[in-house]
Amino acid sequence: LENMGLKSFANKRIETFSGGMKRRINLLAAVLHQPKILFLDEPTVGVDVQSKTKIIEFLHHLNSTGTTIVYTSHHLREAQDFCTEIAILDQGKIKAIGSPKNLLESYPNTKNLEDIFIQLTGKNLRDVT
């Protein structure tokens, strides 16, 4: 609870928590049994900045202690900063895979993963459904 900034809420009822606080509690519940692999589907979507920061810090800590994290996100800049390996998918198919550094080196006319996505798919991120 302390790592997620929730220690002072230990004796509070969960229905009084904000959405971001509930997201952090759910993440803590997911790691209670110390899984070797953790699957997360957009864990920072729709949360406040404080919760997002706490979640990312916690995930970095988990990863540094040996937990493999499979992390889905539509926020490619967040993925670029957080992930060591990235697969760019479009319509269920892998379009590119590698470390952020290797992907950026493989597509020299791009500045970030969003540019690579657009180059590979011909779609702007907002056009993707």
Task: State where each predicted segment sits.
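ABC ATPase "signature
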Residues: 97-98
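A short, surface-exposed alpha-helical micro-motif characterized by mixed small hydrophobic
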Residues: 79-81
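Catalytic Walker B motif of ABC-type/P-loop ATPase nucleotide-binding domains
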Residues: 38-41
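Conserved ABC ATPase signature
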Residues: 13-17
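Helical segment within the ABC ATPase nucleotide-binding domain
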Residues: 53-65
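Conserved ABC ATPase "signature" region
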Residues: 1-9
